[in-house]
Amino acid sequence: MKSLGVYLKHYKKESIIAPLFKLLEVVFDLLVPMVVAQIIDVGIAGNNRPYIVSRFGILVLMAAVGLCCSFTAQYFAAKASVGCATELRQAVFDHIQALSFTELDTIGTDTLITRLINDINQVQNGINMGLRLLLRSPFIVFGSVVMAFTVNVKCAIVFLVTIPILFVAVFGIMLVSIPLFKKVQAALDRVTGMTRENLNGVRVIRAFCREEQSVADFEKSNDELTCLNEFVGKISALLNPLTYVLINIAAVVLIWQAGLQVNIGSMQQGQVVALYNYMLQIIVELIKLASLIITLNKSVACAERVSGVLAVPTTMNYPAKGGAAKKVTGDAAVIFKNVSFTYAGAGAESLSDISFTAKRGQTIGIIGGTGSGKSTLVSLISRFYDSTSGEVLVDGENVKNYTKEELCNKVGVVQQRAVLFKGSIRDNMKWGKEDATDAEIWEALTTAQAKEVVEAKQDQLDFMLEQNGKNLSGGQKQRLSIARALVKKPQILVLDDSSSALDFATDAKLRKAIHNLEGNTTTFLVSQRIAGIRQADQILVLGNGTLEGNGTHDELMKTCEVYREIYFSQFPEERAAYNNESGVIA
């Protein structure tokens, strides 16, 4: 919570002016009953029309000034709350960008979206209402008591007895409801996550006829959220009737006491009206205060959740100064030295004691069963994750010694799930190199076998992509993603099963074009198909996180049982022709 106060400090002036103008408005509100009392006791009782008109003019003037004060307070409160929320949202987004994949996996995408949008909006609403009403309501209540004492001390005692009881009731309910609002927000996170999952997987759900099960699962989570909301709502709903009962009892006692004072001549009728108006003001302000407390409870709960995200430390730190990229020694592009890796919260290692060397210009194929650690291995090269033990070296330097920019310039990554952003094809291609020329873009598109895809579009490079490239096929998105990585001409290219949606002919052309790239580009090909990596200079065979084999295709056919099993599962007709003695295909 304290960490969030930093963002409100940037709006000190607005945070001071808004309550001050609200308090100025309160002063006029407190004077109104006294003016009304004068109209009754002096003007009406004495049939003094000029006096009534003059006091009515004063009331109109006070209303106009109070309205101006209210508008001014609202303006500065809105400026402070919106500005604070904007800076807070930017800070959270920047912090998310700095988090490693480990923290992102732990927190979850749905939770981060909720924190970034819903929770910060709730914080903004709380700041706005707090600056306007947090001082106004108590000041009205306290001021009404003081003004009541100036009218009649005996009647004012009713106020002194009533106010503490009301505060105990209001704040007692507040203390009970705050923890419950946190549970409501947690339940909302679950519903949001389920909604996102179902909408993203709607085609799979329909393909397996799981609509009824999905509806049932969502209904269960939604019912849990509803029950929590109803329970909290019932507790919060006690505020208004409870305050009304207490205030109405106090009003009855007040009128009875005031009537006695009028009968003995200690008070006038206008003063009774003034006291009752002060009691009504207290009723209105306590109702506002009750509503404000509910809003602030939600805002505090949301602020704590947002603060929790900001408090998550990033485990991935980059050096402040570069220089590692200049230290190129030897012909080894990538070296893994006894590398092991375990995902946060996982019981077993995903990679265990992996060691190999990839030389410049080589093509490294990586194959293995599902969950064998293929994607995990290549993600360590680009430092999406840090190894649990061992070292990952790029150009002879530990990846931890590179700045983020240096490593990003060296390594181009195309992941299995192709992600394109809303905008033109040209804009997406320039993610790899901001100053890329059209010639460079077309060169990359040609290598990625995406040239004909772009040429077929009416606007070609200016063709507008929808969010996540929804107006393209899966294969087209993969080819454009590969082209985006090729634009910056990386020294190391990682293709993480990124051609899975391509047909065999296009895939073969793509592999040939990448193999013929100019320069000493080291390419890592993660694939489920041996045909895609068969010609690689070196093939890594993974099984349950361990390196089962390392060598060329022919070498692995002789020495690696796991590789042979994968090969024969994809080419069963070759099993009979396999010569066990020579270890080659006949």
Named regions from a protein language model:
Residues N47-G57, M147-V161, F231-E304, V309-L310:
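Helix-loop-helix
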